[in-house]
Every structure is written in C-alpha cells, then in structure tokens.
A protein has these predicted regions:
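The feature marks long extracellular or luminal low-complexity segments
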Residues: 18-140
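Sec-dependent bacterial lipoprotein signal peptides
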Residues: 1-21
Length: 140
C-alpha cells in the first residue's frame, strides 16, 4: 500500500482541481477575441487494462465568439509535454473547429502524469491526464 500513496495523492489533487461544474472559459484570444474551453473525456487512463477501462482519451476544445456562438474554422494546436513525446501520441496535432469543436485523441504507452498544451491563437492552456498501470484484483 505505501508504494501507491504518491499516485493516490496525485489523483486526489487532480480530482480536487477539476471539481468545477463547467470547464473554465479561457481568453479572449488576439486578434479575434474568441473564448474557449478545454476538457478531457477521461482524465484517468490505464495501461494493460481490460476492455471496460479507458486506454485513450479525447482532448476537446470548444471555441466561441464574443456573443457565445460556436466558431468554425479556428485552428487548434495540441501538444504533448516534451518529456512524453516518446511515450504517447496525440492525433491530430492540429485541427480546425467544426460546430465550434476540435478534438484530438491522446494515447499513452507508459504511466505517469501527462501534460497536454492546447493553443488557440495567442492563448495556451494545459491540462493533465493521469496514466496508471492496471493491476487485477488479487484473491484472498
């Protein structure tokens, strides 16, 4: 149990940081004045997990104009922290919004806390994803 304490504490901190009901509205960007939200479909992933546990996750950006309407055709860039480049992928790395949304799939190959940075015009924002190794329950 003591070896899992750091991972458990990291999960608790990340859960606490993401408790808000709605994603934080970021921006306005320059020059367009857009605002955007950043969310992750599954902030906790598992390596070597059975079929029901998530092994990859969608990183989702929603862009809106000053009136709150979704904006199409806005370039969004998704970047993995340099320390994760050899151990994970994010596809695509650039996307244009459709119906105000752009998404990329993050797929890790190792455990740890991965950071993804999203750029919309001049505004960048980070999110963290926790990747754990799956250990099947042991019989007693």
């Amino acid at each position: 149990m003591p070896r899992y304490v750091p991972c458990i504490l990291l999960c608790v901190v990340l859960s606490w940081a993401g408790i808000g009901c709605a994603p934080k509205l970021l921006g306005p960007t320059t020059p367009s004045g857009y605002r955007y939200t950043l969310s992750v479909s599954d902030p906790y992933l598992w390596i070597n997990a059975p079929g029901t546990l998530p092994r990859s996750t969608a990183v989702i950006v929603r862009v809106q104009n000053a009136q709150g309407q979704p904006v199409d055709g806005v370039p969004v860039e998704f970047q993995i922290d340099p320390s994760w480049v050899q151990n994970a992928s994010i596809t695509p790395q650039r996307a244009l919004t459709q119906d105000g949304s752009a998404r990329a799939i993050f797929a890790p190959q190792t455990t740890g806390a991965a950071r993804i940075t999203v750029h919309v015009e001049n505004i960048a924002h980070e999110t963290a994803i926790v990747v754990q190794s799956y250990s099947p329950p042991q019989g007693r």
